[in-house]
Amino acid sequence: MSKENINLPKTAFSMKANLQNKEPEILEYWKKIDLYKELRKSNKGKEKFILHDGPPYANGNIHMGTALNKILKDIIVKFHQMDGKDSVYVPGWDCHGLPIEWKIEEQYKKNKKNKNEVPITEFRKECREFAEKWIEVHKTQFKRLGVVGDWENHYATMSFEAEAQIVRELGKFLKEGSLYRGFKPVLWSTVEKTALADAEVEYQDHKSDTIYTAFPVKKTNIKELENTDVIIWTTTPWTIPANKALAYNEALDYLIIELGDEGDFKNKKIVVAEALLESVIKDCEIKSYKEIKKFKGKDFKDTICSHPFLELGYDYDIPMLEARFVTTEQGTGIVHCAPSHGPDDFNLCLKYGIKAIETVDGDGKYTKNLPLFEGTHIFKANPIVIEKLKEQKKLLSNGELVHSYPHSWRSKAPLVHRATPQWFISMESHGLRKKALKALDDTKFYPDKGRERIKAMIETRPDWCVSRQRVWGVPLPIFVHKTTKEILVDDNVNENIASIYEKEGSDCWFSDSPQRFLGDKYKAEDYEKISDIVEVWFDSGCTHAFVLEKREDLQWPASMYLEGSDQHRGWFHSSLLESCGTRGRAPYESILSHGFVVDGKGLKMSKSVGNVIAPEDILKKYGADILRIWVASSNYAEDLRIDYSILEQHADSYRKIRNTFRYLLGNLNDDFQKIDLESLDIKQLPELERYMLHRVYELNNNFKNYFKSYDFHNLYKELLNFCTVDLSSFYFDIRKDALYCDSKNSDRRKSSIVVLNIILESLVKWFAPILSFTTEEIFTLINKEQKSIHLEQFMKYPESFQDEELHKKWIELKKIRDICNISIEAKRASKEIGSSLEASLIINLNKSLFEISKNVDFSEICITSSALVHQSNTDEIIIKTIKAEGNKCPVCWKINKVKCERHSD
């Protein structure tokens, strides 16, 4: 063999990926072949895997969290498809709700248009058009990420079919009697003028006014309590006018103390919990006091107080009520209760027959029910209330506190609890809470900690408020009799409404006569037509009903729901309640939740901080496959960090993977030969090739186990290590000589070519769900018959590939090789030799290692010109590296004293 006849690698697969330009070409190819349609045909009739898409909101460009979510879904869908399942993916969008209303209102303000002068149906039409526009934008952005789905047949919560089914689902709750009208405190946004769900709330630090306020004892069974002030502490002074009761804990110890010279409270007696006395003394700067009496909380029974504003028109009794929620964590051990402004307060007062009244209107202003304060906005009321308390000599102390406080995640405005008439689904009346908790026990969670998180929420959540006081949403399909106040429950009316919505949408609820919906059986003048809309979480909670159950290509329940960890209180939660309430079980078999995307330091991304990275910017700089590597390599169970230094590391890993493929393709000259694994006589292969096939078999088992547990970051890590350690640093390094310098007909080279073909097919399939574009690029080079790598199935390997004894042997041989390489590198560092081929090895091994090293050519596996192996009497491996003597072969560069046998022609 002459130097000119060296088998140099040759491939059209370039070293430079150029993903930014290559990926759009592949997208066009997928569009041309209609990849999604081909996927459905290829696995038609097989077991289904249904990942039901949680609908993103149709508003604004996608962000890193959305990209993470969609890529993770796509990886899983593709894994199951290549595992032989019919893995259907139908993308969807959440379309109703406040954010879109706000956008349209902003446009109105810009154009000096008055929303109140615009017909509701026209406003809703503009909302619909806005959502439709962003759905199309999102489609393009998701496709660019490499996400494959039924884009032409997506679902949307604003579709007529969806709105009709939402009506039918509400009808089921109505029929069983668990949907009711109630007057309860709900989280309310005075900016958005509507109730909010827990999932629409975020907690931020907020500075609140604090007060220690006196409620004079009016009647008591404890003599020492006469002429005493009960002290409460609150961070919401504006709720004092709405106070109806005080709460204590019967198990706590309380103290009556007499103050010294303390201004308005000079020589007055006050009562606080013993455990909190020290903090009260400190906060209120009390200089002197004496203890009068200690007693148990249970002795408060039948005690009545007066309102601090008794002289200002608040001349009603304030009873003291026993409550377990009173603790000694903060305050005075006595809690002021305003039933219109807190769930605990409301429930306690309800228990004792004290009704909540409307004290604050939708704008956040006091109503006429509160003398003195009517018309004042509650967020401006604190100074006024504090001043009035001072005037009445009922203010012991006031201050400020920075604490975590609920805000609207949309407007960022602080929220309040406000009692309003709303529509609720009961958690208790038909056992919804129990059904939901049972369903969670039957659901798989990835990671498992998600189960306890959502369980804790279900265990403590109040009844589900499903009404909103807005216009862009599905109208509540409810009529209430004007005289009897009874809710109309009639399946025929409900189905009539649903049928109308199915044909023309729900706008007609706002424009058409009630008689059209009631039919001939009832008179419209007898009924109030409810004008509230359904909260958006009920909308999306019904997707299982109008997507999974209605489409022939899907099935109910879904195999998996996959969203961010915030959806334990959002979509996972609402879907669970809706499905358990109507079908008795969860609409999913498993839940996978992922963390949030944060910057490289672990901080929340914020435009004001300047640490936001947009998917679009990453695609322009790196391409989608680098972003997909970031998703696959990250532990989604935690928050996921990203910045350009992290992406650069992934780009470097990608280059290593790409070079691995390039080496395989180059040595095969892009002439891939599919190997029949079952008929392959593995015993005829050299030991090194047999070992590599064992590694392929072993890696495939690990791959399947990681895949089944959705442990992608360890799966990716193992694939990357196989490329860099097993292949590039080991097998490729050793076999480069045979592949380049052996004749094409040599058994050793032909055996290696067989293994390279198997490794190439294995790797391109293992990586396909992750590197969707790059593997497609490779597949077009090696397979002219099939249309796409994504239509392929994972390989199945014969058990003959598995050889544990050989594996154990090569573990030891690789250890010897590593020690030899250290010795060679030392000689190279001292300039005694150049390349390893200028070295000869003398290897001394103990008896057991010497035995397994028989018939092993260490010059081959250590890439030296020669190697001698001796048995020694010591357990230590002793390596001596000397400079090889002889002539250098111009082809293989090995140095021998005799002519190179391979290249002597």
From Swiss-Prot:
Catalytic activities: tRNA(Ile) + L-isoleucine + ATP = L-isoleucyl-tRNA(Ile) + AMP + diphosphate
UniProt keyword Nucleotide-binding present: yes
Subcellular location: Cytoplasm
InterPro entries the record matches: aa-tRNA-synth_I_CS (IPR001412), aa-tRNA-synth_Ia (IPR002300), Anticodon_Ile_BEm (IPR033708), Ile-tRNA-ligase (IPR002301), Ile-tRNA-ligase_type1 (IPR023585), Ile-tRNA_ligase (IPR050081), M/V/L/I-tRNA-synth_anticd-bd (IPR013155), Rossmann-like_a/b/a_fold (IPR014729)
Record remark on domains: IleRS has two distinct active sites: one for aminoacylation and one for editing. The misactivated valine is translocated from the active site to the editing site, which sterically excludes the correctly activated isoleucine. The single editing site contains two valyl binding pockets, one specific for each substrate (Val-AMP or Val-tRNA(Ile)).
NCBIfam families according to UniProt: ileS
The protein's name: Isoleucine--tRNA ligase
Gene designation per UniProt: ileS
